[in-house]
């Protein structure tokens, strides 16, 4: 993987011919604005940003009868702590009791609604079902009216508000936003919300439920999942890297230790085991995938991020759990069986995905082998120090300071390598430092997130995509750059000049090149599991028929 450290940054002289534009409703210093360069400093043409056809997953087998919709509500939900009651279907998702005329409700920057085609509410980010029933009725009527004319409603723009609609089978998802997110970015956020719902029930189960009863109240089966959806939407506001870049973030770790942990996962296998993941603080340590299961289908980063968010639920703070989970991008109609455990009272989490429903004890034995191996490697102590936990599970997620780069004037950045030689072996990843002053407060983090979203939308504009954007704002200077090797967003001090920004970015690229073995997983390990028992378990093989 090339980090782009040897790539020459654009020279200051070439920046004088930049086109001057300005973000809407954004104050800038005199002589500032946005400078966009639709040219590649390396002389390369712009790569296509459209989605490509992905390999088709193996043919799934339907979930066992015990996982039919009628019994799914009895499955333990990691989104709801065991010592707290789940919210009733009539309760508010966001804890805000108001309607569109309520000032507190109107003050929210973004609202997300999920409802059925019949107008039955499923999830609300803020407000109560009773107060917003009329609003959701209007949404359903709008969609039905446009569909009756043989068309599909995608978005509505009204002054500084956007309404984005997404129809996914029998579910209607709507985002109402006054943030700087583009319609495409809001649609991606709605897809992530839909994926979270599908991960609990599967797409086939949702379709079967509403085919049987159109006005079914799906909240009964999703009780407790509202908190997971809330956390997902909060992360977009304050830490947008994963969803914005379509990648996962790794824990910075010395390559020898990461390779040793990968080899440990490769050795500790069980029949039907498809994927092993070590994570801490919602970030990936390493992962190993079974050769036969995932050899022809790359694990999508959206699915992996969903798993990382899932195991970050408060209910996984201690002990172990066994529950079915669906990976929507891999196969939206089937279940894996997930074993989740915290290791040695540490925040390190082990996730084992298998295809056999009765494999809990085999997975638990595998966990003990992993735990013993990590102690032998001294990994527990190293991970605890890297995360800054000191056995305190309430501490923040593992990260590094932007000061480690050694580039004065650099406040924050998002970096995603794009030179991935083998998409079946390499996970899309990104790295970013911890948000520090002046972005310690929530409103400042939201403002930085808005700036990143604006830059991303300009770089990936379908009508006029850009290569380089230099933006001088009121409180910071930003530079966004995409090449064939990387995608980079940097936030700099407002006092940094154009020439100074180029020097900072050059130093940052050299640092990433030097540290890439520590920041990224170069080649996720693969392994072959022991053969599955030849008993009657073939009919209960979970997701796959050929194992």
From Swiss-Prot:
The modification Phosphoserine is found at residues 59, 61. GO terms for biological process: protein targeting to vacuole; vesicle-mediated transport. It comes from the Eukaryota. The keyword Phosphoprotein applies. GO terms for cellular component: cytoplasm; Mon1-Ccz1 complex. Residues 1-106 are annotated as: Disordered. Keywords: Acetylation, Phosphoprotein. Pfam families: Fuz_longin_1, Fuz_longin_2, Fuz_longin_3. The modification N-acetylmethionine is found at residue 1. Residues 57-66 have a biased composition (Pro residues). Interacts with CCNT2; down-regulates CCNT2-mediated activation of viral promoters during herpes simplex virus 1/HHV-1 infection. Found in a complex with RMC1, CCZ1 MON1A and MON1B. Belongs to the MON1/SAND family. This is Vacuolar fusion protein MON1 homolog B.
């Amino acid at each position: 993987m090339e980090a782009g450290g040897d790539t020459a940054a654009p020279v200051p002289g070439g920046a004088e011919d930049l086109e001057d534009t300005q973000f809407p409703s954004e104050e800038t210093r005199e002589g500032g604005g946005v400078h966009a360069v639709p040219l590649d400093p390396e002389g390369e043409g712009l790569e296509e940003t459209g989605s490509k056809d992905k390999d088709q997953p193996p043919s799934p087998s339907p979930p066992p009868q015990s996982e039919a919709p009628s019994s799914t509500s009895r499955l333990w939900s990691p989104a709801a702590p065991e010592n707290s009651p789940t919210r009733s279907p009539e309760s508010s998702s966001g804890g805000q009791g108001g309607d569109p005329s309520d000032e507190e409700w109107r003050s929210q920057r973004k609202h997300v609604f999920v409802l059925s085609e019949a107008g039955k509410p499923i999830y609300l980010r803020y407000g109560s079902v009773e107060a917003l029933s009329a609003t959701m009725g209007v949404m359903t009527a709008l969609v039905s009216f446009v569909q009756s004319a043989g068309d599909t409603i995608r978005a509505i723009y009204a002054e500084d508000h956007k309404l984005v609609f997404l129809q996914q089978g029998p579910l209607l998802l709507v985002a109402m936003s006054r943030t700087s997110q583009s319609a495409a970015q809001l649609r991606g956020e709605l897809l992530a919300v839909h994926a979270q719902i599908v991960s609990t029930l599967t797409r086939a189960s949702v379709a079967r439920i509403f085919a049987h009863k159109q006005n079914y109240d799906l909240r009964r089966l999703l009780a407790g999942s509202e908190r997971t959806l809330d956390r997902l939407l909060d992360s977009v506001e304050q830490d947008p890297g994963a969803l914005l870049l379509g990648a996962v973030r790794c824990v910075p770790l010395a390559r020898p230790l990461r390779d040793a942990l990968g080899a440990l996962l490769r050795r500790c296998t069980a029949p039907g085991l498809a994927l092993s993941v070590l994570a801490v603080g919602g970030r990936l340590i390493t992962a190993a995938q079974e050769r036969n299961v995932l050899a022809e289908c790359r694990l999508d980063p959206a699915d992996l991020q969903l798993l990382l968010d899932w195991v970050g639920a408060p209910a996984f703070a201690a002990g172990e759990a066994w529950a079915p989970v669906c990976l929507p991008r891999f196969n939206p109609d089937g279940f894996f069986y997930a074993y989740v455990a915290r290791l040695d009272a540490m925040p390190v989490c082990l996730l084992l995905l298998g295809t056999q429903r009765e494999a809990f004890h085999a997975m638990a034995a595998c966990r003990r082998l992993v735990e013993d191996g990590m102690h032998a490697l001294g990994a527990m102590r190293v991970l605890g120090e890297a995360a800054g936990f000191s056995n305190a599970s309430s501490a923040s997620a593992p990260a590094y300071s932007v000061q480690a780069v050694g580039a004065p004037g650099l406040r924050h950045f998002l970096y995603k390598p794009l030179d991935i030689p083998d998409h079946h072996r390499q996970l899309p990843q990104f790295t970013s430092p911890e948000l520090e002053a002046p972005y310690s407060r929530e409103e400042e983090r939201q403002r930085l997130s808005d700036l990143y979203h604006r830059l991303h939308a300009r770089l990936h504009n379908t009508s006029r995509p850009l290569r380089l954007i230099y933006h001088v704002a009121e409180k910071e200077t930003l530079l966004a750059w995409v090449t064939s090797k990387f995608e980079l967003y940097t936030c700099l001090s407002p006092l940094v000049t154009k020439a100074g920004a180029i020097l900072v970015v050059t130093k940052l690229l050299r640092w990433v090149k030097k540290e890439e073995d520590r920041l990224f997983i170069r080649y996720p390990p693969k392994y072959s599991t022991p053969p599955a028992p030849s008993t009657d378990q073939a009919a209960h093989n979970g997701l796959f028929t050929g194992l």
